[in-house]
């Protein structure tokens, strides 16, 4: 299983003091040097953490795989085509939310999505869609032409009892299996940490996990190098 590191909250910490440090690009390079297979950043419409210049510098620096999380807007489409990350992940976005709160409503926005992703793919960029682990959403992602789905693991991360965790894990496992049967590659992310990630090692269909907050929080205490290596030891 591969690890993609989200560096958004390095930028959050930097922006708290309107400073130049810590630098998300430096964090990304350290993550790559210590085994991360990809770097994730979310250029939100309000630019609350990652800024346009961060994205430009990340594109210059990242040597593995750059995943640009973004809303399905014309502005972001143009930015993606100009910047050319290896991958974009379409996510829902609300200005009042602290973090992404749920999967992309692919059923509601299906027709727009089909038109939206073609110019991106024509530019040589793969498309992933952040969705709930539900068969109908997966089916729509496949028929729209996406290459990848990222399964929303937020509800799983909030479960408390073993029974609740197992129920949600089975839901994710079933969704991952179905997605692979439809020819999609599968990523998982949101709310995963150094403890609740462990059962995901048994879901062979999930090729990568995307982790941000938990890893950056640990990096604040032990350093980015150690935080990345610790996570890689757990997932592999």
UniProtKB/Swiss-Prot annotation:
Question: According to its UniProt record, in which pathway does this protein act?
Answer: Cofactor biosynthesis; pyridoxine 5'-phosphate biosynthesis; pyridoxine 5'-phosphate from D-erythrose 4-phosphate: step 5/5
A Pfam family reported for this protein in Swiss-Prot or TrEMBL: PdxJ
The protein's assembly and partners: Homooctamer; tetramer of dimers.
User: What lineage does UniProt assign to this protein's organism?
Assistant: Bacteria, Pseudomonadati, Chlorobiota, Chlorobiia, Chlorobiales
- Supply the name of the protein: Pyridoxine 5'-phosphate synthase
Ligand binding (3-amino-2-oxopropyl phosphate): 6, 17, 191, 212-213
Q: Tell me the GO molecular function terms.
A: pyridoxine 5'-phosphate synthase activity
Does NAD appear among the keywords? no
Keyword set for this entry? Cytoplasm, Pyridoxine biosynthesis, Transferase
One GO biological process from the UniProt record? pyridoxine biosynthetic process
Q: What is the enzyme's class at the highest EC level?
A: transferase
Question: What is the protein's species of origin?
Answer: Prosthecochloris aestuarii (strain DSM 271 / SK 413)
């Amino acid at each position: 299983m591969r690890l993609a590191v989200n560096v958004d909250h390095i930028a959050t910490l930097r922006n708290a003091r309107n400073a130049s440090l810590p630098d998300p690009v430096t964090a990304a390079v350290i993550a790559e040097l210590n085994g991360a297979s990809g770097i994730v950043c979310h250029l939100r419409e309000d630019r609350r953490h990652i800024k346009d210049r961060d994205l430009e510098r990340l594109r210059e620096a990242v040597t593995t795989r750059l995943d640009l999380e973004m809303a399905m807007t014309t502005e972001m489409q143009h930015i993606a085509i100009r910047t050319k990350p290896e991958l974009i992940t379409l996510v829902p976005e609300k200005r009042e939310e602290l973090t992404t709160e749920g999967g992309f409503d692919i059923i509601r926005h299906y027709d727009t999505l089909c038109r939206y992703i073609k110019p991106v793919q024509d530019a040589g960029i793969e498309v992933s869609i952040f969705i709930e682990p539900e068969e109908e959403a997966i089916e729509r992602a496949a028929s729209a032409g996406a290459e990848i789905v990222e399964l929303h693991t937020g509800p799983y991360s909030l479960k408390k009892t073993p029974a609740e965790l197992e129920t949600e894990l089975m839901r994710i496992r079933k969704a991952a299996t179905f997605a692979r049967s439809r020819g999609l590659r599968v990523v998982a992310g949101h709310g995963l940490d150094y403890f609740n990630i462990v059962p995901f090692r048994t879901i062979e269909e999930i090729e990568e996990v995307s982790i941000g907050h938990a890893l950056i929080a640990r990096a604040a205490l032990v350093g980015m190098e150690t935080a990345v290596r610790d996570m890689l030891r757990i997932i592999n």
